[in-house]
């Protein structure tokens, strides 16, 4: 009887200590998440991702906080992809105009038999740059679509 009472008291004490440390860990994880959100709102996406990564490594048991951190990570990735898409789009428009201008000039020079190797090389390089930008644009669109799909799950 005495042993079972001592055992019960020890278990209750251990359970209480675990609950307290769990609450402290949960609070610390929440603080880390708030810090990551602050970085995100300031536009420091890399710092926000690092904070989220640290949260996941240091507090693996803070499941609810980690779920919130995952949503924040998705928002960060989405924002980065949208900004990169906007930049890629503006560069793509400029390079498209450059390519059309160079192509028209080279075609006129070819017709007049005045096309130089430098002009032809410039046309080829501009076309390669244009194709590369189109691929990048398509990849960013696909990434944004994928992130939206994951956010709905």
PLM features: residue spans?
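Bacterial N-terminal signal peptides that target proteins for export
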Residues: 1-7
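A conserved position within tetratricopeptide repeats
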Residues: 56, 96-103, 110-113, 117
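Boundary/linker segments of alpha-helical solenoid repeat arrays
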Residues: 60-68, 84, 97-104
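TPR/TPR-like alpha-solenoid helical repeat scaffolds
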Residues: 62-82, 111, 119-129
